[in-house]
Amino acid sequence: LSSAASDVYKRQEKGSIGKAYGYQLGVKHQYKEGMMDQVDRVLFDLKNNPYSRRIMTNIYVHQDLHEMNLYPCAYSMTFNVTKEPGKDKLVLNAVLNQRSQDILAANNWNVCQYSLLLMMIAQACDMEAGELVHVIADCHIYDRHIPVIKELISRKPYPAPTVKLNPEIKDFYKFTTDDLIV
């Protein structure tokens, strides 16, 4: 790569992206109910106040940007709970906001990982997974990727796989890769 991103990779501490992504989600914050990280807060609110319009994560923390090797691309999720008439379970929907996306390198990963995250959170909160709306401010294809993308577009599509989770897992933090059923 000959881009600003490749310079970042050269500078970064081996194996670390700095204070981005997981680091930000794991920072404990004081709430009136006690200390929680962002994931714990989402789980708490979904279980205790599911119709709140304040259930979200945000990992674009300006005071820590200088310690991130890359600014977060996918930076916030907002959760919304609905109830379908005639059904007992609530439905968990989410909006994923992303400032930038390299369509070839990231799109499939982002869609899969955040869809799976939505499914895991829904199951842990005894809800059904609903819609994931993915908002990308700058979705781009680099010139050097055009031949590969043309090749991919020309291929015969296969049916999308069906993805399920082990229904026995009720604790978000107990999921393992073995609980993903494709």
What are these regions (language model features)?
Residues 1-5, 9:
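Single conserved hydrophobic/aromatic residue that forms the stacking wall/gate
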Residues 2, 27-29, 81:
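A generic structural signal for solvent-exposed, polar alpha-helical segments
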Residues 7, 13-45, 52-73:
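Cys/His-rich finger/ribbon microdomains and the adjacent scaffold used
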Residues 48-56, 60-173:
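Conserved helix-adjacent loop modules within structured domains
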Residues 175-182:
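Mature extracytoplasmic enzyme cores
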